[in-house]
A protein has these predicted regions:
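A short, well-structured beta->alpha microelement
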Residues: 1-5
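FMN-binding flavodoxin-like domain, especially the glycine-rich phosphate-binding loop
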Residues: 9-14, 19-135
Length: 135
């Protein structure tokens, strides 16, 4: 993370991947250093396109912003998960083949494997332009 460059700008776009329902500690540290900045957040999350879940994530991530920073806007989309996650889900399902939740987790991993897509990225770019430039 290049915090010095970010701190020199008036508006900062910060990208992150969802880590246990929030952002990584390094992103949290960057956000806490962005005093007086307008901040646009964009991120990926392994679990589906649920706007209410995305809002919960953004609320948790935003709680790391410096007190005098302004959230200019945000965008989230589904993101891929690593192969170790798939292996864990497969092992869980092997132990309990009738478990609907485990099946849903594995199905979601498959659905997420090609994300973010070009459409996801285009939507994020459009949201950033609208929030930052008013376009």
């Amino acid at each position: 993370l290049e915090a010095q460059g970010a701190c020199a700008a008036d508006t900062v776009l910060v990208g992150f991947w969802c880590d246990k329902g929030a952002c990584t500690p390094s992103v949290a540290a960057l956000l806490s250093a962005l005093h007086g900045k307008r901040v646009f957040l964009f991120g990926t999350c392994g679990f589906g396109a649920d706007q209410s879940y995305y809002q919960q994530i953004i609320d948790r991530v935003t709680s790391n912003l410096a007190g005098d920073a302004e959230l200019a806007g945000w965008a989230m989309c589904q993101g891929k998960m690593g192969p170790a996650v798939k292996q864990r889900y497969e092992a869980m399902l092997e132990q309990d083949p009738d478990n609907v939740r485990f099946k849903m987790l594995l199905d979601n991993w498959v659905a997420a494997k090609d994300h973010p897509t070009k459409e996801d990225l285009d939507n994020m770019a459009a949201a950033a332009k609208k929030a930052v430039l008013g376009e």
